[in-house]
UniProtKB/Swiss-Prot annotation:
Protein keywords: Chloroplast, Plastid, Ribonucleoprotein, Ribosomal protein, RNA-binding, rRNA-binding
Family that this chain belongs to: Belongs to the universal ribosomal protein uL22 family.
Keyword Chloroplast (UniProt): yes
Ranges that cross the membrane: none
Name of the protein this chain belongs to: Large ribosomal subunit protein uL22c
Subcellular location(s) per record: Plastid, Chloroplast
NCBIfam families recorded: rplV_bact
InterPro entries: Ribosomal_uL22, Ribosomal_uL22_bac/chlpt-type, Ribosomal_uL22_bac/org-type, Ribosomal_uL22_CS, Ribosomal_uL22_sf
UniProt xrefs under Pfam families: Ribosomal_L22 (PF00237)
Signal peptide: none
Gene3D superfamilies: Ribosomal protein L22/L17
Record flagged with keyword rRNA-binding: yes
Length: 140
């Protein structure tokens, strides 16, 4: 990724990994259309869906999901087959404003929206409920 597009990984708990892509050059509304389709799905199903979707927003989201899974397997020893998208959100970023020259010395403003995409992966095999922790049983 270029220096403008940053990717971060945050550690929040032992069963989830968060990946963040910032300043992606597309409208948040168009990216939300794709993110709404993958929320709650398994990792393998998500990759298959994103490869087949005809939207321009699916490629950066595909790269982010793939990177989050690689970070999860490397840093937290998650099995990618057991991972699923627990949270996926798109927030609006800054708007890049340009001016296009027009006839007779006029200019026309152009607004290029950006967005920030957050993907949270959870591991089903390491998921424990409060009751299981209290009773000491293992959730399979």
């Amino acid at each position: 990724m270029s220096s403008k597009k940053k990717q971060k990984m945050k550690r929040s708990s032992s069963t989830q990994v968060q990946a963040l892509a910032q300043h992606i050059s597309m409208s948040a509304h168009k990216a939300r259309r794709v993110v709404d389709q993958i929320r709650g799905r398994s990792y393998a199903e998500t990759l298959m869906l994103l490869e087949l979707m005809p939207y321009r927003a699916s490629y950066p989201i595909f790269k982010l999901v793939y990177s989050a899974a690689a970070n999860a397997s490397h840093n937290k020893s998650f099995n990618e087959a057991d991972s699923f998208i627990s949270k996926a959100e798109v927030n609006g970023g800054t708007i890049v404003k340009k001016f296009k020259p027009r006839a007779k010395g006029r200019s026309y403003p152009i607004k290029r929206p950006t967005c920030h995409i957050t993907i949270v992966l959870k591991d089903r095999s390491k998921k424990k409920t409060d009751q299981d922790m209290f009773l000491g049983t293992k959730n399979v």
